[in-house]
């Protein structure tokens, strides 16, 4: 999902790149992500951060989508020098998704979907090689609960390190329709990071929720360039 932006950033900065496989992801299963749970997901993220800390003096977290929410939640670690978030999942675009973590949320989702699965629409065969295009709805209830517990002002105001946010937005019709852009911008305003150390950037030509992958957009180079411009400014020395 981050390729090639993460590789190009690491190369330009002379940095190591560590790409972890977080709990429940990247598996071939008969029932994809049926056994996903937030505790295991969180523990795998903390373990990944510990590995990253062994690879260099400072850590820059690059987080896409739900990984952006995870990065924000990890940011209290003093070894993290900056966050770069791409279409971070502060809230899902469809406001009805908040029902997922409520009583009867799973049953409502099954009724709405007509079954037990959420499927990625319009994914190419190549994209299906790297994304899990069909997942059990149970996993979405856990993901929504994670957002409920973590993506709030009390989390954001504690963050004081440099933060870059990139997202797809051109107008009300042409924008990220997987996660909420207004929720991202509200989060940005609530960060404890000084104004000089935080930057938000819309990429109107990205055309997709995933702005960092060659499989989703032809304009990923713009994302790389803006990220590097930001990091070189805020991480001098």
Feature-to-residue mapping (PLM):
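Catalytic nucleophile-loop/oxyanion-hole region of alpha/beta-hydrolase
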Residues: 27-55
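Gly/Ala-rich beta-loop-alpha elbow adjacent to hydrolase catalytic centers
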Residues: 62-67, 71
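Short, surface-exposed "cap/lid" segments of acyl-processing enzymes
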Residues: 1-14, 19-22
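Active-site nucleophile loop of the alpha/beta-hydrolase fold
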Residues: 84-95
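Serine-hydrolase catalytic core
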Residues: 128-207, 222-232
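Histidine-bearing beta->alpha loop at or near hydrolase active sites
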Residues: 24, 202-216
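Short beta-to-alpha linker loops that shape the active-site pocket of alpha/beta-hydrolase fold enzymes
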Residues: 21-26, 89
């Amino acid at each position: 999902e981050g390729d090639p932006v993460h590789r190009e950033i690491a190369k330009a900065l002379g940095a190591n790149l560590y790409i972890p496989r977080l709990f429940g992801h990247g598996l071939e299963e008969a029932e994809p992500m049926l056994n996903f749970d937030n505790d295991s997901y969180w523990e795998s993220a903390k373990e990944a951060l510990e590995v990253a800390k062994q690879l260099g003096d400072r850590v820059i977290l690059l987080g896409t989508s739900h990984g952006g929410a995870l990065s924000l939640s990890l940011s209290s670690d003093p070894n993290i020098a900056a966050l770069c978030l791409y279409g971070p999942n502060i809230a899902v675009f469809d406001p009805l998704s908040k029902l997922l973590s409520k009583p009867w949320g799973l049953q409502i989702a099954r009724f709405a979907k007509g079954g037990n699965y959420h499927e990625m629409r319009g994914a190419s065969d190549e994209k299906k090689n790297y994304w899990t295009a069909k997942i059990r709805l149970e996993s979405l209830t856990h993901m929504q609960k994670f957002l409920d517990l973590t993506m709030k002002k009390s989390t954001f105001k504690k963050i004081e390190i440099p933060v870059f946010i990139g997202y797809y937005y051109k107008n009300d019709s042409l924008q990220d329709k997987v996660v909420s852009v207004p929720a991202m911008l509200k989060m940005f305003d609530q960060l404890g990071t000084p104004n000089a150390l935080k930057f938000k950037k819309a990429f109107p030509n990205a055309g997709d929720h995933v702005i960092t992958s060659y499989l989703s957009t032809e304009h990923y180079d713009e994302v790389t360039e803006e990220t590097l411009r930001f990091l070189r400014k805020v991480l001098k020395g």
